[in-house]
Amino acid sequence: MYFFIKTINKYLYKLIYSFIVFYQKIISPILPARCRYYPTCSNYGKQALAWYGVWNGSLLLLKRIGRCHPLGGHGIDFVPLPLASYHYQHVSLIMSACMKAQGLYVYRDNNGYVARLNHMMKLT
């Protein structure tokens, strides 16, 4: 049963993603530029599908398309980061002092929005 669901998710992902690419390559150049948000709804849909999967990504995309009308909002609206997938660990004071003494106390942002976006750009 799990294999069946995984296969359906894979084909739905390919179907929705190919529809977005078709829209970007064929339909979007014909229409005048009128998008109210940055990133555009099609780019938002690609990121939402990549980060959240077929079901949640499609819901985010439908909510975004529902907001994209003359009486709706405008401006910068990025895909929310899936922070629930991160695991946070408590570092004790002794451990942090040890890390500082060894020179390991360097903050490197691997979980921020820019890092995730760069990682996704490398995958596509």
Curated annotation (Swiss-Prot):
Going by the entry's taxonomy, the superkingdom of the source organism is recorded as Bacteria
Q: Does the keyword Cell membrane apply?
A: yes
Question: Which cellular compartments is it found in?
Answer: Cell inner membrane
Query: Which keywords annotate this record?
Result: Cell inner membrane, Cell membrane, Membrane
**Could you state one GO cellular component term attached to this entry?**
plasma membrane
InterPro entries tied to this protein = Membr_insert_effic_factor_YidD
> What is the membrane topology noted in the UniProt record heading this document?
Peripheral membrane protein
Keyword Cell membrane tagged: yes
The family note in this entry says: Belongs to the UPF0161 family.
Q: What does this protein do?
A: Could be involved in insertion of integral membrane proteins into the membrane.
- Tell me what this protein is called: Putative membrane protein insertion efficiency factor
Q: Which organism is it from?
A: Psychrobacter arcticus (strain DSM 17307 / VKM B-2377 / 273-4)
